[in-house]
Amino acid sequence: MKQLLDFIPLVVFFAAYKLYDIYIASGALIAATALSLAVTWMMYRKIEKMTLVTFAMVVVFGSLTLVFHNDLFIKWKVTIIYALFAVALLVSQFVMKQTLIQKMLGKELTLPQSVWGKLNFAWAMFFLVCGLVNIYIAFWLPQSVWVNFKVFGLTGVTLLFTLICGVYIYRHLPGDQEKPEEEKSEQP
């Protein structure tokens, strides 16, 4: 349910863009994100830090887009959010010596420290690459291409990357693992 609440503002943004324009869509994104945040608070009495950072960026860059009537601000939002996430992940790993990924998922999963480090670094690189691709699409391709990329491209690639990370995590979960056939046949 929580992921659905996080996804609704994106759907509202896309619909408003298709029906009206980028400026109505930016205002709708601000309103939908605020509403999503309020509903999340009412349902769970907790809001994740990443959600608060995203909300703040939506308000700041969405408002700048509306005030200056310039879509560059809303286009930069994606890259700046992803850059902040990447920096936070890298600082947690290399400065704080505890990965954010482990801090978020460590209560549910038991993984070797090296796996946590690889996952954390992989997500940091993922966010950096997505931010760079966003810059290219936002500034070199038509606005409609950027909107489709923001809504469908980034969502799709994030789901795919999450699935790949899930497979990677599954491979490293502790538990009874089958021995290779040669080892089984050698046992008395």
From Swiss-Prot:
Bilayer topology term: Multi-pass membrane protein
Highest taxon above the source species: Bacteria
A Pfam family annotated for this UniProt entry: IspA
UniProt cross-references to InterPro entries, sorted A to Z: YciB (IPR006008)
Entry's Gene Ontology cellular component terms: plasma membrane
Protein's name in the database: Inner membrane-spanning protein YciB
Signal peptide (from-to): none
Recorded name of the encoding gene: yciB
Primary residence: membrane
Keywords for this protein: Cell inner membrane, Cell membrane, Membrane, Transmembrane, Transmembrane helix
Transmembrane segments: 22-42, 50-70, 72-92, 121-141, 149-169
NCBIfam families, alphabetized: ispZ (TIGR00997), PRK00259.1-2 (NF001324), PRK00259.1-3 (NF001325), PRK00259.1-4 (NF001326)
Task performed by this protein: Plays a role in cell envelope biogenesis, maintenance of cell envelope integrity and membrane homeostasis.
Family: Belongs to the YciB family.
Localization, UniProt: Cell inner membrane
